[in-house]
């Protein structure tokens, strides 16, 4: 009978150990599943953040590009204005020279006409 108590004790111990092991495995699986779900949620959140970051980065690049374009357009516009202003000044100077030249030519024509009349 002693053997049967010992045997029962060993079987009971092994059954308890296996139940404890099974419960530990079940808890580990449950924790692992929970960690997996949390990891998936965190990964999805990171992916969403990454996409939003890329959108924001793209928008910043567009804004910088438009600022550069606007700046270059403003620079080009000011250069065109300066060029037109210079052309206008040169045109006015040319008109003044033409007027002076016209007066000189008229004076010469008058002088010649008076010389030929006498």
From Swiss-Prot:
Residues 41-71 form a coiled coil. Residues 1-22 form the signal peptide. Keywords: Coiled coil, Signal. The keyword Coiled coil applies. This is Uncharacterized protein P23A10.17.
């Amino acid at each position: 009978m002693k053997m049967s108590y010992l045997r029962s004790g060993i079987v009971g111990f092994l059954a308890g150990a296996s139940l404890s092991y099974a419960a530990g495995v079940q808890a580990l699986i449950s924790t692992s599943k929970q960690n997996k779900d949390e990891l998936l949620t965190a990964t999805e959140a990171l992916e969403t953040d990454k996409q939003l970051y890329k959108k924001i980065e793209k928008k910043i690049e567009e804004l910088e590009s438009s600022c550069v374009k606007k700046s270059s357009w403003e620079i080009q516009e000011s250069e065109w204005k300066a060029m037109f202003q210079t052309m206008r000044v040169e045109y006015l100077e040319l008109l003044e020279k033409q007027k002076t030249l016209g007066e000189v030519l008229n004076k010469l024509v008058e002088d010649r006409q008076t010389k030929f009349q006498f």
